[in-house]
Amino acid sequence: MASPASVAGGGEDSNGCSSLIDPLLVSRTSSIGGAERKAAGGGGGGAKGKHWAAADKGERRAAKECGGEDGRRPLLFRSYRVKGSLLHPYRALIFARLIAVLLFFGWRIRHNNSDIMWFWTMSVAGDVWFGFSWLLNQLPKFNPVKTIPDLTALRQYCDLADGSYRLPGIDVFVTTADPIDEPVLYTMNCVLSILAADYPVDRSACYLSDDSGALILYEALVETAKFATLWVPFCRKHCIEPRSPESYFELEAPSYTGSAQEEFKNDSRIVHLEYDEFKVRLEALPETIRKRSDVYNSMKTDQGAPNATWMANGTQWPGTWIEPIENHRKGHHAGIVKVVLDHPIRGHNLSLKDSTGNNLNFNATDVRIPMLVYVSRGKNPNYDHNKKAGALNAQLRASALLSNAQFIINFDCDHYINNSQALRAAICFMLDQREGDNTAFVQFPQRFDNVDPKDRYGNHNRVFFDGTMLALNGLQGPSYLGTGCMFRRLALYGIDPPHWRQDNITPESSKFGNSILLLESVLEALNQDRFATPSPVNDIFVNELEMVVSASFDKETDWGKGVGYIYDIATEDIVTGFRIHGQGWRSMYCTMEHDAFCGTAPINLTERLHQIVRWSGGSLEMFFSHNNPLIGGRRLQPLQRVSYLNMTIYPVTSLFILLYAISPVMWLIPDEVYIQRPFTRYVVYLLMIILMIHMIGWLEIKWAGITWLDYWRNEQFFMIGSTSAYPTAVLHMVVNLLTKKGIHFRVTSKQTTADTNDKFADLYEMRWVPMLIPTMVVLVANIGAIGVAIGKMAVYMGVWTIAQKRHAIMGLLFNMWVMFLLYPFALAIMGRWAKRPIILVVLLPIIFVIVALVYVATHILLANIIPF
């Protein structure tokens, strides 16, 4: 077994910082995002958990005996598999449940006896679908694998004694769509965390894609570059974590792991004051830009339109104007590429504020900052802009001309680097001697630091991130999840993995577009070991940059099809990963003890459901496209194909769940109505199958390192989604098939803490939308059914047989189960009253009693009028 340092990633960075397995730093994670999950027994990197065993002892022993004399790269990550004492019972239960499900199907077909035959037919179809979808979900989970980067080995291999590095280049992409829905402060904190990451400054570059073309984001990026001259050296000098200033300064008592503790308190105070001033400048930007533009426009010069938006250098902004006109509005403007910070080897090209003026001593600290570039792709109503995928492809082309790094990692603007070693961690998998050359991308789990403590709407989704994704890691690899994922540039270009790759590949303009510099960059990228210093940026080069991000550049090329991120689908991430896996590449799942990245999640129910509609609708779009897992992906492994098939059809399950969830209205029928006879045996079968699936879930909880609360929240939100978002997605898909109109892309609104003193204010705001109607109907139907059931029991208690009473209790338990699953939705309806959930606990029994009394009174009244 390896030492803790080699498992979690140890050693010291270039500034003498302690590794991230240092006890002080690990203990302090209780104050930051993700700590509660870790404390609960899960999370990410717990490789030494009692249910996991090292799976690569033989490989490591052989590598140690060789001592690196064969010239091969070292082993840079550790692999762990679930111990047989847990894995074998887990697999056995899956087979046992499969047999039980088949026996249940056979029994139902033989006993086609029901009071409502059409409902029986639909319920049998539903049960068959439940069994099929469960099997698709379960089969890929037979061999979970946890992979942990070995940062110590990476440093020994890549950080040379003379201060140079073997590390490859990384281009970091950040995408934002709108400065209103996605607050500028979030975006700039993301950029700052990237600039301060522990990676050689001359081997990384950051590209911000602004899909709105707004001047405020460019000028905010300039302000961020100025503040970075203070923030980045401060992070390096004092080894702070996390390196997003907003998150760092929210910590009540951050632990210190640097080597200049005497200076830390004073430095931290100065930087905090500078950060507060930085935020004030960001908040003032809209008014600053407006006033400046008014001044220039009032001069009545002969330059352009009278209501132009002006930059600080006295030129008109080529993007979206405050008062939009043709060619200067959102959705119609020229492409823009501006190098805010040039490559460190040439120095920075801005008159940036000198951090030494703040009385901070950075003499022993590297004060250089990575390259920083603003990109706003051109938009034109005559061309489809292809949403996020189009923005990423524009960044991919612009970065190819500027830095052309071998690897690319992308972030949504509301995420930030929470662990400064994260970029190095991903590189461990890309450079490993075993599967490194065949690894197309490394996906990290998504973690969130703005979620309410009880995670009402299952935002952490740990059943998926710590369960399903580890299972896929044992196959061809996890799917791409849209953010926090490092790609090999060649894989995005549609190049096959080494085993399948042809010799002498010649990039063609029909595939990559009509840009000589871009085609040359593709040839350079094929030489994977080469690191090239970016060319100087002159006027001719700028024109070429603006051409490759123009609205029409990828027209009649392979961009969005066989090259880059995939177009014409709402879930461009899943389909892009599918296309790459289909070429024979594999992917890896990187878990770290200290979460690599953190972000914000929609804690408002309506916003969360809108997000689910887009994801699930995009999954259905994938099924009805040429990327259908049944026919696409010629080199997909069989179980990897099964997992992708499950990702594309899971929303259909909601139709049958909705059918069952609404069935309690049958309590309103005076006579007894049974879906299946004999009813008792039917219920016993159901209970056995349900019990077995929860036993399997219990074993998954064990090896995934999650809690019962995580599992239960997943069940609850799946029920809420199955009565709202998933049926809506199915309806959208039907409309799409009939009208050829795709799923509408809607940017998820983010709440800033500055908007209110209550961090979780959005949680208690109920925004009614039509998709919530079915959920409300199900909730009311089950509340009414429970009340009617109580009333019926009061009326017929002396008449019913023991079997009838038993059947009534069984039906009542089903109603209660649905109510428990919809509990978060009931809290959402209560709004701010949900802060006192005891109100719901008291209110529901009162409603049950009222409904029961109404039923009894109605029964007595009708009995006197209409004799039975």
UniProtKB/Swiss-Prot annotation:
Question: Which SUPFAM superfamilies is this protein grouped with?
Answer: Nucleotide-diphospho-sugar transferases
Q: What is its EC number?
A: 2.4.1.-
**What does the entry list under GO cellular component?**
Golgi membrane
Q: Where is this gene product found?
A: Golgi apparatus membrane
Q: Where is this region: Disordered?
A: 36-68
Where substrate is bound, by residue? D412, D414
Q: How does it sit in the membrane?
A: Multi-pass membrane protein
User: Its principal location?
Assistant: Golgi
Positions of the catalytic residues: D211, D573
Keywords assigned by UniProt? Cell wall biogenesis/degradation, Glycosyltransferase, Golgi apparatus, Membrane, Transferase, Transmembrane, Transmembrane helix
Going by the entry's taxonomy, the superkingdom of the source organism is recorded as: Eukaryota
Report TM segments: 86-106, 116-136, 649-669, 686-706, 717-737, 771-791, 809-829, 837-857
Q: Where is the composition biased (Basic and acidic residues)?
A: 53-68
Molecular function via GO: cellulose synthase (UDP-forming) activity
GO terms under biological process: cell wall organization; cellulose biosynthetic process; plant-type cell wall organization or biogenesis
The top EC class is transferase
Family membership, please give it.
Belongs to the glycosyltransferase 2 family. Plant cellulose synthase-like F subfamily.
Task: Give the protein's function.
Answer: May catalyze both beta-1,3 and beta-1,4 glycosidic linkage on beta-D-glucan. Essential for (1,3;1,4)-beta-D-glucans synthesis in grasses and cereals (Poaceae). The mixed-linked glucans (which are not present in walls of dicotyledons or most other monocotyledonous plants) are particularly important constituents of the walls of the starchy endosperm and aleurone cells of cereal grains such as oats, wheat, rice and barley. They can account for up to 70% by weight of the wall.
- Name under which the protein is recorded: Probable mixed-linked glucan synthase 3
| Classification of source organism | Eukaryota, Viridiplantae, Streptophyta, Embryophyta, Tracheophyta
